[in-house]
Amino acid sequence: MTDEVSNTAAADVRDNGQIVFDAGAIRVLAVLAEKEALTPDAYPMSINALTNGCNQLTSRDPVMALTEVDVQGILQELIADKFVAEVNQAGARVSKYEHRLRMKWSLEQDKLAVLTVLMLRGIQTAGEIRTRSGRLHEFATIADVEAALQFLIDKYPPLVARLPRAPGTKETRYAPLLSSEVFPEAGELPVAAASGVSRHDRIGQLEAEVSSLRDEVEALKAQFQQFKQQFE
């Protein structure tokens, strides 16, 4: 399924200080954080490269269809809120952009890697996060992932929520608390949703391994595109 960006502001602030982003802003921030680690030679990012990253078919849930105009508008909102900075490099013909998540939320790379994967893919288990974040940060054990998750949960306002186990599943799931989405508490998960998560858990490991290989291909494509742009 493909999601379109909404026309609402990129971010809002709740009474408790929690910042709520729309789906487009979450995707833009996550892609900036992801590509900073995966393709540092192509970072900061141009609007064209950022749009392609937002609409990437792999390692994204949901798949989106943002235009460069959409991304430009989102960037301006995020710049105003100081989550993104515009970078004008010497000799460059286009502006480029970088995220400021480390500074805004005081995050080390392991915590940023976990949050980035959650922002890109939504609800996941610690095991799935460990597998999918390997190229952003190498976690030695699942316990290390859980420690990073706990840090994000304990922040005020929290950036991540621990969700109840779905019926028929063994692993705890985690969700990013950056949107207006309301997550169920213990005992409230609908049967249909539980069934979907159960199936997701069964195939998660294989899906993550395939996505990791696809990410490598996307990284190579981005590097090649950056090389081509030097001659344009």
Swiss-Prot record:
Belongs to the UPF0502 family. HAMAP family: UPF0502. This is UPF0502 protein mma_2112. It comes from Janthinobacterium sp. (strain Marseille). The lineage of its organism: Bacteria, Pseudomonadati, Pseudomonadota, Betaproteobacteria, Burkholderiales.
